[in-house]
Amino acid sequence: MKLLLLASLLSAAAALPIPLGQSGGSSSEQRFNLYPPQILPFFPQFPLPQAPLIPIPFPFPFDPNQVLTPNQLLALITSILNQLQGFLGR
């Protein structure tokens, strides 16, 4: 157990590089610079276009509390797929 604790402490100490060879006095800010410099992204960030809302007409009056029969469920799925097919241009 002690060996595992020692190994984890050594790996954590090795993971934090401390710059050496700085001329003049060094402040704690220079020695322990934990935050990387802020670099602007190479490609500009464009907002992604929002998908348009498509009104999907149901083939029958739909009550969310009613139980769908297999034929009604198939008709609903077919109607939705036909609407999406027309929107996607296939």
UniProtKB/Swiss-Prot annotation:
Keyword Secreted in record: yes
Location (main, coarse): secreted
Tissue distribution: Restricted to tooth and associated tissues. Localised to the junctional epithelium at the cell-tooth interface.
Gene Ontology CC: one annotated term: extracellular region
Localization: Secreted
Signal peptide: 1-15
Keywords for the protein's UniProt record, in alphabetical order: Secreted, Signal
Keyword Ribonucleoprotein: no
Lineage: superkingdom: Eukaryota
Role this protein plays: Tooth-associated epithelia protein that may participate in structuring the basal lamina at cell-tooth interface.
Protein name: Secretory calcium-binding phosphoprotein proline-glutamine-rich protein 1
Species whose genome carries this gene: Rattus norvegicus (Rat)
Gene: Scpppq1
